[in-house]
Amino acid sequence: MCHRSHGRSLRPPSPLLLLLPLLLQSPWAAGAAEKHNSAGVHYATAYWLPDTKAVEIKMVLDKKGDAYGFYNDSIQTTGWGVLEIKAGYGSQILSNEIIMFLAGYLEGYLTALHMYDHFTNLYPQLIKNPSIVKKVQDFMEKQELWTRKNIKDQKDDPFWRHTGYVVSQLDGMYLGAQKRASEEEMKPMTMFQIQFLNAVGDLLDLIPSLSPTKSSSLKKFKIWEMGHCSALIKVLPGFENIYFAHSSWYTYAAMLRIYKHWDFNIKDKYTASNRLSFSSYPGFLESLDDFYILSSGLILLQTTNSVYNKTLLKLVVPESLLAWQRVRVANMMAQGGKEWSQLFSMYNSGTYNNQYMVLDLKKVTLKKSIDRGALYVVEQIPTYVEYSDQTNILRKGYWASYNIPFHKTVYNWSGYPLLVHKLGLDYSYDLAPRAKIFRRDQGTVTDMASMKHIMRYNNYKVDPYSKGDPCSTICCREDLNEASPSPGGCYDTKVADIFLASQYKAYAISGPTVQNGLPPFNWNRFNDTLHQGMPDVFDFDFVTMKPILT
């Protein structure tokens, strides 16, 4: 299904390459590796050659190597690719920056072909007007130069040191993908294109901030277009278990998925989590969804809050850290929810404005107590981040998240009161369709099967709260909208509980819901939307995700 022509050019035109750290300016690859164009499990090990500052790749699984792992290209059969990488556990003693660089290099090498596909699919979804490309490039170049300068100038600051680890990983991904492209005789992706992929969430707000548009009818607004999602944390009545789940909403052009398991041997006293499992995409060094299980005992979920107050978007500046970067740094450094919130709040870009739920499983003693600090809720808008401990609400049974701000200040500044005035209570926090459905049905969750069920729920033809709208429900199917079908909506679900999380284990399903007899999504109805590398039909079951490397 996926056609790759030799020497194929990628959009947009290459910008000036941005600066890379000094170590990347040496010859960066050595050795040959066999080509892989087909599905299957592909093993690889990266070796750091310190004398030449080069990387050698061998298609073996060598635990003495500096980074090793595999990519299971099973997208056509399960809807998911699976990537697992361990770095820094080899025979060499390496700096944290080199460990992160090699982890990124190996991921870029193993997943380069799907990175190309994913960029091809997403670029036209975000760049509707070619005139915006130069503005985006200029902003991202300024933001990167500002970030790298702070990393260089503040090496003794733990926050900026960890930001440097993330940037090293990105540099490695770029060069690893470049190495793979040269072997496949493809034109390599530029650094801007890889930055573009990682910033997809941020671009949802950055592009409108750079391109003022005339006011349009709010009635034409499609909630899934901004990457909206549904999330639920459910506590059983006697605190016997705590479940957490997330269902992503966005364009179906984003359905090229990779579930990732990382284990990086970072030696830094300020690093709280160096092992994590999360849902993700090709070329992304973050989840985007978000759904993370962290070795610190934290769980991170997220849903997007739109900013209807366009004046706020004018306050976005490049001298800031993008949301994906701040999430990664907070994930690495935070021991608890409050610390995560404080770290995430630093250098707020005002892009990818979300509600984050930080669940601290260390604060949960089953059948006994859920201690203060177990749930922090964090919300961002341009110039402002608010967070609060909402454990008390969680103790009462559940926390639901459905793309409407919880904190009053964020709700008001984002423009929701005007939206409610113009469009009705469907946009209010308490009486949005998903608020009502979660309130009604969360009590039916008693086990993993019922948790999966509520997160895939769509009974729009019958449910009075849906009023016949296939997106006024937990798992949206905008492609079934009779008036104006679009290939977008809810396209996955990830579910786990406190027991599974201790093993970095989750259940994940890829594709739009087929609950209550809904037809499986088929691309043949929407062939005008690029979907390179994807299955034609999405009708998959839940898959067990669990790391297996030792």
Swiss-Prot record:
Disulfide bonds: 471-476, 475-490
Biological process terms in GO annotation: phospholipid catabolic process
The record's account of how the chain is modified after translation: The maturation cleavages that produces chains A and B are required to open the putative substrate binding pocket. Both chains A and B remain associated in the mature protein.
Superkingdom, natural source: Eukaryota
Pfam families: Phospholip_B (PF04916)
Glycan attachment sites: 72, 309, 412, 527
Localization per Swiss-Prot or TrEMBL: Lysosome
Signal peptide extent: 1-39
Enzyme class, UniProt record, top EC level: hydrolase
Primary localization: other
Protein name in UniProt: Phospholipase B-like 1
Organism name: Rattus norvegicus (Rat)
Gene assigned in the entry: Plbd1
